[in-house]
Amino acid sequence: MVPARAELFGSVCSSWNFIRDKSTNCRAYLCHMYTAELIFEHFPELTPKQKEQFERLGPLYEEWNAKINVISRKDMESFYLKHVLHSLGIAKVYDFLPGQVVLDVGTGGGFPGIPLAILFPDTEFHLVDSIGKKIKVVNAVAEALGLENVEGSHVRAEELKYQYDFIVSRAVTHMQRFIPWIKGKLAKKNFDDKRPNGLLYLKGGDLAEELGPLKAQLTHLNQFFSDEFFETKKVVYLTRKEIQGFHAPKVKS
């Protein structure tokens, strides 16, 4: 039984495990998976304001996606799982601090930047993409949610003149092609003595060949999220030092 979209992004179910019989468990599981309840389960310390913002994400993207295709129609059916929760996987690896400035490269419609900005309201997020219509959606969603810590810019990462404490991204391209885009974009002085400035990159699959000589810290997301979607999903952490010292070989297109 697959619920209609109106049901998927309608009022959020108060609980997904309230009845035990098979049919209602199926319906309750779908409700849980397709709404912000999925986020509330994994991040129980959310404030009422943050919960409201996460609840509004689904309808906002459903509305914008009808005008500008920033997320595949198929993926909208599992929006909170494949886009919101996946983005928040970075938060299972690192808690951004108040005052830090984070760059989201190739943000598309706002991922992972928008969900992270909701979770860390005292951290500044600069979301960039080379496609202007996607940034239009980013800024509209941020404004609708009252996210004053988000700025979206229609620009390529290579063209940026600023430096950041962290860079985040989600499977934009081959890692060894990505690294040259962000060289020089990380501040030399660490904001957090416990975690050197660097890149937090969401990526799936076998990364041994792709990472090559890069000394990366890999965190498997299936230790936090049980859905099979996360079976091969990871957060790749690279320090600024590792990024600055990397010389990319030629990568096939």
PLM region descriptions:
Residues 179-196:
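A short glycine-rich, Lys/Arg-flanked "PGG" loop and its adjoining helix->strand segment in the class I
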Residues 205-253:
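Active-site capping/gating segments
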